[in-house]
Amino acid sequence: MESPKYAIVDLETTGHSHQNGDRIIQIAIVIMQDWNIQTTYTKFIHPGKSIPIFIQELTHITDEDVRDAMPFEMYADKIYELLSDCVFVAHNADFDLSFLQAEFRRVGLPEWHGKKMDTVELTKIMFPTAISYKLSDLAAELQIPLKQAHRADDDAYATALVLKKCWEKMMTLPLVTLELIHKRSFRLKS
């Protein structure tokens, strides 16, 4: 049996609500199998509108950065293909997946179906004494490099390493504990 492939995804967007017209401005996907990074995919995406100033300040992604980028529909098939046989992983998976699903619908692709994993929820189980579950704080605590928070490429890479750290910690736990985690994992929000 082949080991699972994970697509660790991070998006930067023009805001928090695809329902209100916010759009993706950067996507990064890290494909990991057997706890090794197989490939990475990163694109700036033209949102079809100006990036709000507070988003530019948060992400350091400007209108100039996306001016010559293609719109999502030019990348949609490739993104869909990358996710097709993977477990979808993100730090706050509901946010990233809901944005992607909205974009897939908008360009006429079917909704993506598959397993998903939220590293926020996973780290709450594996590192219950962490000071914070913000990606930048976890990265610092777990000694994971994070060059620039709120850049999709750096965040996706750090999230991949957080996932790997969770797996490494899981492998140190007794079987009875792993069975309890598995049983209770079905009640997690994600």
Kindly give the residue locations of the regions a language model identified.
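A short, structured active-site edge motif that brings together acidic residues
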Residues: 113-123
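Short, glycine/acidic-enriched loop or turn micro-motifs at the edges of active sites
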Residues: 13-15, 121, 158
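Acidic two-metal-ion nuclease catalytic site recognized across multiple nuclease folds
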Residues: 1-2, 162-190
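Short secondary-structure boundary/hinge segments and terminal tails
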Residues: 24, 74, 122, 156-157
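Generic alpha-helical structural context detector
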Residues: 121-124, 140, 161-164
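Acidic, divalent-metal-coordinating active-site segment for phosphoryl/phosphodiester hydrolysis
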Residues: 151-164
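Conserved non-catalytic scaffold segment of RNase H-like nuclease domains
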Residues: 1-114, 128-150
